Amino acid sequence: MGDTAEDQDDRAMMEAEGVTSFSELLMFSDGVLSSSSDHQPEGNVGDGGEDSLGFVFSGKTGSRMLCFSGGYQNDDESLFLEPSVPTSGVSDLDPSCIKIDCRNSNDACTVDKSTKSSTKKRTGTGNGQESDQNRKPGKKGKRNQEKSSVGIAKVRKERLGERIAALQQLVSPYGKTDAASVLHEAMGYIKFLQDQIQVLCSPYLINHSLDGGVVTGDVMAAMKAKDLRSRGLCLVPVSSTVHVENSNGADFWSPATMGHTTSPSLPQGF
């Protein structure tokens, strides 16, 4: 079949524009397609059709897209794309077409996201309940520990108060009763007792040497034998101390009674 006058005009116009391939046609402006579509008959404008160059286009009701599959050029159902809003259900998309209707896929994605978010919320609430249940024993344990520590502190405070009161009765029964004053008085009292013990023990702690000479082994034995006498002490039989049992010790050691307390039964060595 020979080319018609309209086909020759379209080819001449494409050659004038420098379009030689399909890629250049896609990158080119819509002027060529619009010019080619102007030559179509008015009855086919609403339904779409095929121009003289073999390109498929859709009408006003559908999306204006191209389909490059040569096997579907004679099939009216595959030539025209479905409208953007489907009437019902999810339609299968033609892999040979450029246009991809993602509205249904977005709906599916939103459904998946909503289900995931709901499951996350459920799991989150479950984990929160479990965490609360796990935290409750810890709080109870802390409260029990605090109560036990408070009870121990009270017992220690009571014991300390009792000891302070007993110490206050010893050092200053009619003085101050606060802990600081009682401890201060106790320190002074202890120092006084230490000084008294040192004064009373000083005569008995002096070591006397024999004439200031060198101490030999024999002298050491004699010093050990006279150790008590050298320290001002002596051994007295129990029978000689019977008359001192009912008397006052201070009067017994007074100078007035020292001469009358000598017993003839005492040995000469004492």
From Swiss-Prot:
CDD domains: bHLH_AtbHLH_like. The keyword Transcription applies. This is Transcription factor bHLH113. GO terms for molecular function: DNA binding; DNA-binding transcription factor activity; protein dimerization activity. One of its GO terms (biological process) is regulation of DNA-templated transcription. Residues 109-153 are annotated as: Disordered. It is found in: Nucleus. Homodimer. GO terms for cellular component: nucleus. Residues 144-193 form the bHLH domain. It comes from Arabidopsis thaliana (Mouse-ear cress). Keywords: DNA-binding, Nucleus, Transcription, Transcription regulation.
